[in-house]
């Protein structure tokens, strides 16, 4: 706990310097936190994790590094060209290199000893920046991945859903079917970015750090991939730490303070870059990550959208027209089919926004809304059979359109896990 107090205490011996730098026409603003009066200091540029971040998110660590004699640049992450649905690791890497160039010009900094530090998404970006420029003297990563972003996301989502007690078809839908569709539809930028070629190209020393209880990055796989890919490395695992190397009891909660030894390790390593490579044993994982494969020929995004529109139209169209005989099974099909499709869309939105936390109680591995949708799906199949009998007797276009909706519903529901265990 003493370490955490030191890391978060006011910077008794650190001075700030405002800097600006540009990349691709975008001006970025940052702060250099450094010990006052220092000369020939090593420098460190801190590269953000995913999402919107300002320099203040990393100030406590920058101040801790500055107290160890490291001039540390923190900056506000770009907002132009970066969002949930748009991002480029290449652009972010160039942002980091622009920050490196700005830090190397500082009078208190030794330009030959400036490196990059990257957390999470920054663990993809920082090595990419280093691979592009010899001006980057070293790389530090926290919670970095050795796998593609889509694969990491699937592993992390499954961890969260299983923690909530969920299992079965909903988990498969969220971690495979939905992610594959989002990636193919361009809604998951950089989904299939492969970090391994970049890691293999690095010649700078790399300090890779992971929490053994990380539930966002598969840490065991990451350690193994870094060890087999890098030329010069120091790989360390902190036993009671989570993704950001905060103290934790289970990987999900965040206790006060950083993992004991983390901040000091970065300081000593940066000041004395090791000539030889060392690595801790990979931490155990409950299960391995699985690749999020590209869509097959029969599951393109446009087909899923077309099926969705057709189902909504077929089920909603039937009750709008009262002409001709109305079978009870047809009324049930129109009702259950429409409610199931709309309910699925609602559940998926809640799932994406809250990572399953707002889906309510879980019964037999299924949250109640999903269980209700599965029961409605069975009812829709039964109503489709009854409607087929009614259509055979009456052969009306009204029943035919509705029956077509029921027929399309069956493979659609199987694909999305509504008719699955």
What is the role of each PLM region?
Residues 14-38:
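N-terminal cap/lid segment of alpha/beta-hydrolase-fold proteins
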Residues 64-82:
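Conserved alpha/beta-hydrolase
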Residues 299-421:
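Alpha-helical transmembrane segments of integral membrane proteins
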Residues 87-106:
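Alpha/beta-hydrolase active-site loop
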